[in-house]
């Protein structure tokens, strides 16, 4: 049986993990990206501006981790969006759709009781290194 690659992905352009986990882990060609909240990577603090700015920063952080893995948003096949308030669903969708063009990833969205650091939104993703062939 051949070995499978398992590699930790990290970048200083996204916030360091705030617990005992990796920013992302690559297994073979699949990248599992930990949930990203709207933390500023330089300060480690939640960005001001509520759910709009937090969603933008969370997706920016996600993009930097994708880049560190040799991917971009086109490589994302699944996301999970966690919201402190489901009433923010439409607002987050408006921001989310600006980051994903063409084939949209599968997605689930949930309202949760609380998120780290008082965040209003957290987004995790699974990506696969390409290239892809359209079927």
UniProtKB/Swiss-Prot annotation:
**What's the family?**
Belongs to the RutC family.
GO biological-process terms attached to the record: lipid metabolic process; mRNA catabolic process; mRNA destabilization; negative regulation of translation
Q: How does it assemble?
A: Homotrimer. Interacts with YTHDF2.
Q: Please give the residue positions where the record annotates the modification N6-succinyllysine.
A: 13, 60, 67, 134
Q: Which UniProt keywords apply?
A: Acetylation, Cytoplasm, Hydrolase, Lipid metabolism, Mitochondrion, Nucleus, Peroxisome, RNA-binding
Give the protein's recorded name: 2-iminobutanoate/2-iminopropanoate deaminase
Against CDD domains, the record matches this protein to:
YjgF_YER057c_UK114_family
* Catalytic activities: 2-iminobutanoate + H2O = 2-oxobutanoate + NH4(+); 2-iminopropanoate + H2O = pyruvate + NH4(+)
Q: GO MF terms on file?
A: 2-iminobutanoate deaminase activity; 2-iminopropanoate deaminase activity; mRNA binding; RNA endonuclease activity, producing 3'-phosphomonoesters
Please give the residue positions where the record annotates the modification N-acetylserine: 2
User: What is the E.C. number?
Assistant: 3.5.99.10
| Cellular component, GO, one term | mitochondrial matrix
Question: Where are the disulfide bridges?
Answer: none
Instruction: Write out the annotated subcellular location.
Output: Cytoplasm; Nucleus; Peroxisome; Mitochondrion
Its taxonomic path starts at: Eukaryota, Metazoa, Chordata, Craniata, Vertebrata
In UniProt terms, what function does this protein have?
Catalyzes the hydrolytic deamination of enamine/imine intermediates that form during the course of normal metabolism. May facilitate the release of ammonia from these potentially toxic reactive metabolites, reducing their impact on cellular components. It may act on enamine/imine intermediates formed by several types of pyridoxal-5'-phosphate-dependent dehydratases including L-threonine dehydratase. Also promotes endoribonucleolytic cleavage of some transcripts by promoting recruitment of the ribonuclease P/MRP complex. Acts by bridging YTHDF2 and the ribonuclease P/MRP complex. RIDA/HRSP12 binds to N6-methyladenosine (m6A)-containing mRNAs containing a 5'-GGUUC-3' motif: cooperative binding of RIDA/HRSP12 and YTHDF2 to such transcripts lead to recruitment of the ribonuclease P/MRP complex and subsequent endoribonucleolytic cleavage.
Keyword Lyase in the entry? The reply is no
* Domain of life (superkingdom): Eukaryota
- Read off the InterPro entries from this record: RidA (IPR006056), RidA_CS (IPR019897), RutC-like_sf (IPR035959), YjgF/YER057c/UK114 (IPR006175)
Q: In which tissues is it expressed?
A: Expressed predominantly in liver and kidney. Lower levels in lung and brain.
- Is Nucleus among the key words of this record? yes
Q: Which Pfam families match?
A: Ribonuc_L-PSP
Principal EC category: hydrolase
